[in-house]
């Protein structure tokens, strides 16, 4: 298998990604497959990859636990590849994914309460790139944590 591009470490609840070079001819979305099995001490996940354009295929994973992980990648176009990466302590502002807390509330994985503060952006797909950037800047300054469009 050609050289894979991946991170040696990622924080808990962060985004780990591996990039696999492959064919870009034909219809790579339908004609090719990529799959990874990722195993840590407390979890094993089988994840389908996707075509990201320009002959690049990717698999993305969010680790739930700290420690050593192994990955095993198979595809329809290359030999099998294996490797390792380490999951470190989450950063101060990374509280993990949002879950149901009790029956009526939400909390991040680490127990920090989650308060949904959001808005709706109508006809988003009809806006100019400039208007989209302006809107995203305004939303960021307003401290929204969700958007519906």
Regions found by a protein language model. Name each.
Residues 1-42, 47-50, 85-90, 96:
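Non-catalytic, glycine-rich low-complexity segments
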Residues 37-110, 124-125:
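Extended acidic/polar, glycine-enriched regions
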Residues 117-129:
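The substrate-binding groove and active-site-proximal loops of carbohydrate-active enzymes
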Residues 33, 110, 118:
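Solvent-exposed, flexible loop/coil residues
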Residues 1, 108-113:
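Mature extracytoplasmic enzyme cores
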Residues 131-149:
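Catalytic domains of carbohydrate-active enzymes, especially glycoside hydrolases
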